[in-house]
Amino acid sequence: MATTTTTQGQQTAIDSAVLDDIIRRLTEVRLARPGKQVQLSEAEIKQLCTTARDIFLQQPNLLELEAPIKICGDIHGQYSDLLRLFEYGGFPPSANYLFLGDYVDRGKQSLETICLLLAYKIKYPGNFFLLRGNHECASINRIYGFYDECKRRFNVRVWKVFTDCFNCLPVAALIDDKILCMHGGLSPDLDHLDEIRNLPRPTMIPDTGLLCDLLWSDPGKDVKGWGMNDRGVSYTFGPDKVSEFLTKHDLDLVCRAHQVVEDGYEFFADRQLVTVFSAPNYCGEFDNAGAMMSVDENLMCSFQILKPAEKKTKFMMSTKI
């Protein structure tokens, strides 16, 4: 049984049988039509959030993980694609997972997506890891869909409980001291990895500074040093900054998400950085594939690809025969 103390001080326990039932209900819809909703109770969601929040705070802000592990990028509420990722990679605990953030917003099923991820975090705290993305932030997900989904299916209270949980998510992970993972990218304020370890939690995401950059910055092919970012937040950084950073910290690779890429993954700076994006047909507007990066015991990286659904298939699925 996992026990958590809420901010009010009363004990809330999530019984392991309750947790298993939540996971069962959330995963059995993979056998149904894509898009079928799973409506948990408000009490169950609160238990997931408060229990996961405690685990996040017990674990470091810079996670230190070991391979083998599978790394996934943005999901953005595309729940049926999240279930496809687990079908490809193996449902926990058959594989270790690290997700790089942006679980909510834009897609139709942010609630199912984040609830399953939190449930797996609670069930397998030493094998399943979640980082914070720039959308795990009240000021962003208030606008891009998650708030509206919470309000439509529950109430604003539920959204606030998620906000408290998101404010405690770790922001980076180091795999075998060689692969540094975060949602966005590098920062001009990052001189030592201890600066990540020492970032405060719980916290909102500030408009500038190290935490902001880790979740918002982007690589820029034509940039030397640090450049302006078209997002209006943080910076872009050139291949020179990636090389400099890896050399200084004796690292092999930076792994990040945050940008849709056509093949689901894309290398940068002579394979010193990789972008992984795991939401195929992003928003129904892009023809991109989704990818998951598998890191084996020897730190060899390979990619499993979720192809974008063909338009024809989508049409046939929605047609009664």
From Swiss-Prot:
Keywords: Acetylation, Cytoplasm, Growth regulation, Hydrolase, Manganese, Metal-binding, Nucleus, Protein phosphatase. The modification N-acetylalanine is found at A2. The active site is at H135 (proton donor). GO terms for biological process: dephosphorylation; gibberellic acid mediated signaling pathway; protein dephosphorylation; protein phosphorylation; red light signaling pathway. Its EC number is 3.1.3.16. InterPro entries: Calcineurin-like_PHP_ApaH, Metallo-depent_PP-like, PP1_catalytic_subunit, Ser/Thr-sp_prot-phosphatase, STPPase_N. Mn(2+) 2 binds at D102, N134, H183, H258. SUPFAM superfamilies: Metallo-dependent phosphatases. Expressed in the vasculature of roots and cotyledons, tips of leaves, guard cells, bases of trichomes, pistils and stamen filaments. Mn(2+) 1 binds at D74, H76, D102. Disruption phenotype: Dwarf phenotype and decreased fertility. One of its GO terms (molecular function) is protein serine/threonine phosphatase activity. PROSITE patterns: SER_THR_PHOSPHATASE. GO terms for cellular component: nucleus; protein phosphatase type 1 complex. Binds 2 manganese ions per subunit. Its cofactor is Mn(2+). It catalyses: O-phospho-L-seryl-[protein] + H2O = L-seryl-[protein] + phosphate; O-phospho-L-threonyl-[protein] + H2O = L-threonyl-[protein] + phosphate. The keyword Hydrolase applies. It is found in: Nucleus; Cytoplasm. Belongs to the PPP phosphatase family. PP-1 subfamily. Serine/threonine-protein phosphatase that possesses phosphatase activity toward para-nitrophenyl phosphate (pNPP) in vitro. Acts as a positive regulator in the gibberellin (GA) signaling pathway to regulate plant growth and development. Promotes the GA-induced and proteasomal-dependent degradation of the DELLA proteins RGA and GAI by directly binding and dephosphorylating these proteins. Involved in the regulation of phytochrome B (phyB) signaling pathway that controls photomorphogenesis. This is Serine/threonine-protein phosphatase PP1 isozyme 4. The gene is TOPP4.
